[in-house]
Each structure stands twice: as structure tokens, then as C-alpha cells.
UniProtKB/Swiss-Prot annotation:
Name this polypeptide is given: Probable helicase A859L
Enzyme's top EC category: hydrolase
Positions bound to ATP: M191, A192, C193, R194, C195, G196, K197, T198
E.C. number(s) listed in UniProt: 3.6.4.-
Highest classification ranks of the organism: Viruses, Varidnaviria, Bamfordvirae, Nucleocytoviricota, Pokkesviricetes
Start and end residues of each Helicase ATP-binding domain: 178-349
Amino acid sequence: MYAGFYVAVHPWLETQSLHKVGHTGNLAARLHDGSYTTCFTDEWKYCFTLETPTKKDAQKIEAGVLYCAQFFRVKNKELLCLLPEKIKQLAEDVAKCLDISYTLCDSPTYEMNDSTIVVEPSLPSDPLISKEKLRHLVIIPVEDEDHFADDVLFFSTDETRTAIEDRLYQKEAANMGYQELQRSGRAILQMACRCGKTRVAYLILSNYLQGKVLYLVPGLSLLRQTLEKLYLYGISLKNVLLVGSDQTRIVLNHDNIEMTTNPVFIAKRIQEASSLLVIATYQSSTLLVDDFDLIISDECHRICGEWEIRPFTHVLLNFKKGHRLFLTATPRYDTPLSMKNRDLFGGVAFRYYLREGIEAGYVNDFELQMVAAPKLAHQLSNREETTKQIIVKQIIMALAYLKTNITSPKMLVFTRDIKQAKELYAELVDLGVYALIAHSTLPRQVILKTFTEFCSSKEPVILLNCRLFQEGVEVPELNAVFFAAPRHSPRDIIQSICRPLNKQVQKPHATIFLPLEVNTENVCLDKFSSIIPFADALASEDPRFYEHLLNPSEVAYPINWIGAHGSVSELLHLARHAIRYGTQGKIDRLTRSERLPWKAAFAELKRTVEICCRYPKINDGFHFGGATLRFDTWYKWVIKSYLQYKNKEPSSLEPYQVSDLESLQDWTTRGVGGPYPWEESMAFLETWLAQNKGELVAIDIHQGGWIGLDATPMERLSGVLTTVSQRDGRSYGKNKKLRPKKGFMIPPQQAEDLDRIFGKHNLKWRKDRVNGFLKEDEHGNYTGEPTCIQEAYRTFKEYVKTNPEYIEKYWPGYAKGKHKHQELPHIWESGLAPPRYKAFKDGNKQLIQRSPKKKDVKN
């Protein structure tokens, strides 16, 4: 038997450029065991193996490869989106660094017989490897094309200085961003592409112009664009310094200004100025000195990556002075240096969704078109060639679809790499399709010429690229984008989607094409796996898409198929099912608390507080997008995350969400602490007993007080003592069978408080016990001496009949059923209360409307 590290491929994965890595003590048998044959056909094969002396050595190589390729790994899977040659080189480098001997076998085959089938011994799931030894091997996603485009493509606007009316959300963003800067010194503004982040930045930096402001951008073109916009907003060039490598003078109306990279001049200008605005590229930031009151980092997701000093991280990691404002549409959380680091980046002070920009009319709308795999006339020689031909035909179908509505459509095609772009370009040109190609290995002049030709074309045209035009490039007439290869990064997906969404008069909606290797003859959930990352990214920016996935019959969304023969509705149903439940179809991925759209869930919380005058109850239900949810689950998650945030622990909440919560009435007391605050109620109890000669008088421990925000101290005390009475023993065991009450679930500190307060007046609050069991009869009724709480409840029941004035004074609204329904009478009668959530043993869930006329609203 051969032990070793391996890279395997299956046709279903190959279409997505995914490769399986693993280790085994038996290379001959590995691809034949259940984990490979249960859910896949028997078409697995090894790309290569590294045969090792032991299985443990192979496991270390696998762990090292997964660590070094972490940015190309499918989450929680041993799948890498890398070419086999790249993985092979990485595996060999890892083995050498870990001093593991190996034998490399390319495209190996191993004989399988009965003697090779043995049970492998298990190993610890997390082998100990030195990550420090491997850190230099970590593969960082190459973004050279992004930065290259920044410095090649720039089209000046025709705007002139005019009065600009700020949009309402821009004012709100500026206000919340500035407040968070004053509070913590750091703030992130997460705003969708094309929604005016620069204007918001201007509104904020205007508060700092008496001092020094640094505005960092990721390229020369964006530097010019930012300068133009700030100039239009009213910034004077007299107090502006541009730091960048382009010596071309920039002319704005009658003003002009030059960039510089002279370190002596830059340092002197910054240090001597009392007020100054510096606009610089990240690449030139090493020329700056640390002397700013505010530092704005535009497109700040580009700062993220490996934790090391480089031009993009220089200011972030080295500068100590000033407040920090970070602007992005797509935060990045999947790198060692990421925006999860609250100490460096702060949190999101304001968020503006892509869908909000569309509905407000600032961003062009779009439709999703999934493109089915066509049938090929002839069976091709290999899988790679087949996949290429299918994608070519899908691109042609997409262009034909556009031409039915647009005379001269323009479509960007995003490819996996430059190699794929070249191959598709050659095929399309051979077929007579007007296609262009641009990539970072071409001369700058060629790229600019190609881009100009694409923008000015009067014919239907396709432009193939890998990442060159993914960010920051304006193509006003662009109509569509086509993903020729799956993308897994939410940042890449959203940035690509936004390319054709610039708003123009009479511009038709844009189209996003998602090709799938699916047709009506080969439908299975696995073939939808490539769209799951896309759908997750889009759902986070578009709550309407999220709701559509939950309930397509009630929430329409522009999503369809082209090239599909047969039941399009069935294909759409399968696609939605794969997105919601995954390709295994087991777990509802969309209804977890952290996935619920914040605005919708918070709106229900706010409605409950403001309309119903209370915080959620444990059995409140929530009907969202067709899903039947228990609102208390989300509410508890919010409270837990809020407390983590306030304790400066890792939290799922961002500052803008915390601000939303703290805007609610009594959030920090009733919202977080609950309707029955212990210390407050104990203080009232102590005062009450002192004023009433040690008599509790009357307490309601049946309906549990009143949970409303307007509750009287006596109503809150009733709720507290109800829980005390309930916790002093339980009457039922499992399966609802009667048993002696033995439980005592009152926390020790609370028991001490009750002993101290009631003890002052010789009042008995504990129930009688024998050998730890409550005294009770055969029917489970308590037979011990009544406690002072029970006596007070008897008095309460008498007063309901004989002393209604007393009841109304301390339990207002009791006679109208307020306490019985735990709702204000007018809320109960009008049906405004949240529905009651009920789950059944068979898995069904139901929301029952709380009102005089109950009716089911969801089954």
C-alpha cells in the first residue's frame, strides 16, 4: 500500500475549476471508498500524488497546502480553485519546508484488488504544523489587474460646479459616520456602488478642513476622479496637494494642479500647513508623514490581504494620528488582515444596500438570466474542450438574447484567467462574433485602444477580460456581464454585477448572465453549486432577492432561463432550492438569525416596541418572505451580539445596528434586561414591605405581571415573584408525567436577596420540602404551609372581586384583559400584536394571529 497526498478531479468539479486535495494511507483504494462513490459517479482520477513514508506525513502536507491556499479554498471543503500545476508546485514546496520525503507521481494509476481494501487508522483532525515555516508560501489573490486598470482607464466627467442637493441617505450616512468617528475614532461606510460615497466623504471631511485631511485612493485615475468631484463640491485647489506618479497637469475650469512624488516637498508642505487636503494613491503613501486629523481610505477592501507592510497597508499599520474613515461597497473579511479587525477599521457606521439605490432611482436595475448548457452536435475528445465549447455557445446565446431588445448591446465577459480569455476569444472570432480582449500582459496603449473601441462601437460587441474591468471602470453604455467562470468572493461578485448599473436616461435594465452546465436532461442539484456563492453575495446586497428565495410566489424577482427546453419553472425551482438548502438539500441556510435582512427584522422589533409598547415575547412569531420564524430566536441573538459589542468582544453587530437598537425606548434596561428586572423589583419589594408593616398584601402570580414598557412597579414585581414561585420546584418530568417536585432553580444570589428582604419581616417565601421533595398530594398539589407569595395571590384573587379600585391602581387594565393576553386592549382587539409561533411534532410551523378572532396566517 502507498500512503500519500493527492489531488483528484471529477468531471462535475472540473467544470468549476475545482480540485479535491486529500491524504490517505492507501492511494489504491481511496477513490473507491464511500465518500467518493456515494454522491459522485466513478469518474474520479488522480491529477498527481506525492507518495510519502507514512499517512501522517501526507496529512501534514495536506494541512500545509490548505493553509497556503486558504484564499482559493471552498469554505469548509477540501476543494481548491487552482490549477493542478499550481497545487503541485505548492505541495512540493510545503513538503520541502516540513522536511518530508516524497515521490512525485504524475497522472498515477494504482491497482485495486481485495487486498487493498483495509480500514485506515484514524489520525487527529488537526495535525501540528509550523505555520511560521509556511507563511512565505501563502498564495495571495493577484489583484494586479485591478490596480493596472486604475492607472490606465480614466474618462473625465463633463460636470461643472453647480448647486448639489444632497440625498437624504447621504446626509444620514455623513451624520452617522461623523458621530462614530467622534465616538471611536474609526468608521466604515458600506455603500453600494454608484450611490455617492465621495459626496458623503466630502460632507464628513468638511468638518476637518481647519486641519489636515488625507484622502487615499487605489490608483491615478481614481485620484483624478476624486479631485474632480471634490472640486465640483467646492474644494479650493489652493489647499490641495496631490501625491502620485503622473506628472500631467490637471486642468479644472480655470484652475490647474500637478501631482508630485518629491518626498522633501511633500513632507515640508504637510508639516508647515495649518490646513491641507492631501489626495494620494496608496502606492505613493510611503512618501507621506504622519500628521493628519482625518484619513479617508477609499475602496478600503484593497487594503486587506496578508498581514505585512506594503504600500496599501503603510498608512493603516504605521500612522498613529487622526481619525480613520473607510469607504467601500464590498468589505473584505476573508484575509489575515481583514475588516473584521475592529481595532484597525472600526465597524460599519452606515450601510446602504444596492437594492435601495435601485429603488431610489440612482442605480440602474438588472435581471438575472441563467444560461442552460446546449447540446453539442458531436462528442468532443476531452472534458476541457467540451466545457470550452459549451461556454462559447452560452456566450453567443446571451448576446443573441440582448439583441432582441437592444440594437447594439455591449457585454463584458469575466473569465477565470487570461488563458481562458484567450481561448474563448479565439473561438468567438473564428465563429464571426465581434469580440475584443484585454488583459494586463498587453501594452497600455493597446488596452486603451481596445476599451475605446468597445465603448464607441455601434455594433453588438463582447469584451473578454479576467479582472481588468471589475472595479472602478465606467462604461456608460454597458448592458450586461457574463460570468464565464464561477466566482467565490462576494467582493468580486458584487463589483462585477455593478459594472453595467450606471444610471442613464432611457437606458434599459442590465442583464447578469450565469451559465450553468444544466439542461432538461441532466438536472441534479450538484450542477447548481456554482451559483450558490453568487446568490449568497447578491442576497446580502438585495433583500428583495432574499425574500424571493423564501417565497417566490409572493415576491417577484427578474430571474429566468435562456436556452432551456422544457419546464423553465422546474429549473427555477431547483435553482432556488439549491441556493436555499445547498446541493445536499438538508439545512435551510437562509433563515439563520445572522442571515435575516437587518432592516426587515429590526423594523418588526421597532414596530413591536412602538406600537405594542413592549419587547418581544418568547412565543412571538415573524412572517418574512414566506418563512415562518420564531422571532425570539433572532431577538436573543441580537441581545447576545449587542452585549458582546458593548464588552468589546467579537460581535456580529456593526455600529449602525447598535445605533438602531439604542434608538429604541428603554433598550438598555427593558430590551436587554427583560421586563422583570431583578434588582429594581427587589428594591421596590423592600420599600413596599417597610411601608406596609411587612405585609405583601396582593400579588398576581398566575398571569405573571405585565411585560409592557409602561408597567407599574407592582406589575413588574408580580412577574418576578411568578418566576420565583415557578422555579421553586417543578411538577412534571419527561413526557408530562407527574412526579414529586424536587427542583429548585433559583440562583443562589437571588435566594439570598429573598431571604434577606423577607427575613426582616419573618415572612416565609420558600415552599416546604421533605428530603428535598416538595410536600404534595397524589395529584401533585402542594400541601405544605402557604408561602407569603401564595397568601398574597389569594388576596389578589379576592380583591379582583371585592376591591377593583385597588387592582386598577396597581394593575391598570386588568379588568379589560390586558394581563390575560399580555397585550394592550386596543392592540389585542385590532389584531396588531405579533402572531403567536407554534411548532408541531411533525415539523410544521404555524403563526396564529393574536386577536379576539384568532386565525392561522401561515401553515
